[in-house]
């Protein structure tokens, strides 16, 4: 499955995994192996979502911006596997690209339902920009934003 539906389903899966990762990191820290395994899986899911949305959106800017964002996230996860704490900052920095990429998805989703598309984009931004709070033990803040994003994604999955 690819295209818009594949990208949405992949994003739903990622949102659920992210909730688990946030809880694990909040309780056990960024070097907790099960969390690292899930972070690694998230990089693979990100590649699938990127390829799916790329084919559905057909926007050159989306196509060009995805690899650096995913690559930075992969580098951060690799650093965490190596026991380097700065990997967490690299992952958080990579997620700042999510709302930028999400804007291109938003434009497509707005043709289905403008308000839910705005909820999707706003919650993606709130999640991405609050992710560094996890490093301070405030994992519930990005988790709440991720839950709202998940609700918006589920709305669209049922309509595509």
Where are these regions (language model features)?
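Hydrophobic, aromatic-enriched alpha-helical segments typical of multi-pass transmembrane helices
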Residues: 1-160
């Amino acid at each position: 499955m690819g295209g818009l539906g594949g990208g949405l389903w992949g994003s739903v899966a990622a949102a659920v995994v992210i909730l688990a990762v946030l809880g694990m990191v909040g309780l056990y820290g960024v070097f907790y192996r099960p969390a690292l395994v899930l972070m690694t899986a998230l990089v693979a899911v990100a590649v699938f979502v990127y390829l799916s949305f790329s084919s559905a959106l057909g926007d050159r800017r989306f196509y060009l911006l995805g690899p650096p964002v995913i690559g930075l996230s992969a580098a951060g996860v690799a650093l965490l596997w190596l026991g380097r704490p700065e990997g967490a900052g690299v992952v958080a920095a990579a997620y700042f690209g999510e709302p930028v990429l999400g804007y291109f998805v938003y434009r497509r989703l707005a043709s289905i339902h403008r308000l839910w598309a705005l909820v999707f984009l706003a919650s993606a931004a709130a999640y991405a920009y609050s992710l560094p709070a996890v490093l301070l033990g405030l994992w519930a803040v990005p988790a709440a934003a991720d839950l709202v994003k998940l609700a918006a994604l589920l709305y669209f999955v049922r309509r595509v």
